[in-house]
Amino acid sequence: MAVVKVYDQNKKEAGELTLAPEVFEVEVKPEILNLVVRAHRAGLRSGTHATKTRAFVSGGGAKPWRQKGTGRARSGSNRSPIWRGGAVIFGPQPREYGFKVNKKVRQLALKMALSSRLAGENLMVVKGIELPEIKTKLFAKVAGALGLEKALVITAEADTTLALSARNIPGITLITADQLSVYEILKHPKLVMFEGAVESVQARLK
């Protein structure tokens, strides 16, 4: 059972927190993480690409010349795929790229992603971050104190002041515990969780 230090926003020790082994000490299987990340990214694709087939390209109604007697190769339409300005054969058509991943597999992958950050000593737990006003400079100062360059910060609940102060800092992404995803965890080398966010995630995944 892992016990991690809890820091305040100035990176001073503020206590300890015991992490649930069934959430933070799960064997990592890359093939499951790969499946869930692929499903996530596939779901982001719009799939609106389209090329014109012979059914959609304009023109091509009349036969260019008679079938026999001209000495030329026979042709039935000037919108054939072999003609300049003709249709596209087997081109991309609108489609849905997303595919379903079972809920249990998604939850398992989330546990694996969290476990990988703990095992790699890239998980930091903080009491919380409080800012007196919406100001990027203030959040940047806190990020500097915590040693954050490229990190995913997970808050227990939505905080407009924090969200607006952090959104312009390159490499820092701030989300709430209920928005947590495998893709976001793996995208950032460092994971910073508020103490309340840890409790929320553990309650959801146990």
From Swiss-Prot:
Pfam families: Ribosomal_L4 (PF00573). GO terms for biological process: translation. Residues 55-80 are annotated as: Disordered. InterPro entries: Ribosomal_uL4 (IPR002136), Ribosomal_uL4-like (IPR013005), Ribosomal_uL4_dom_sf (IPR023574). GO terms for cellular component: ribonucleoprotein complex; ribosome. Keywords: Ribonucleoprotein, Ribosomal protein, RNA-binding, rRNA-binding. The keyword Transcription regulation does not apply. GO terms for molecular function: rRNA binding; structural constituent of ribosome. One of the primary rRNA binding proteins, this protein initially binds near the 5'-end of the 23S rRNA. It is important during the early stages of 50S assembly. It makes multiple contacts with different domains of the 23S rRNA in the assembled 50S subunit and ribosome. Belongs to the universal ribosomal protein uL4 family. Part of the 50S ribosomal subunit. NCBIfam families: rplD_bact. This is Large ribosomal subunit protein uL4. It comes from Nitratidesulfovibrio vulgaris (strain DSM 19637 / Miyazaki F) (Desulfovibrio vulgaris). The gene is rplD.
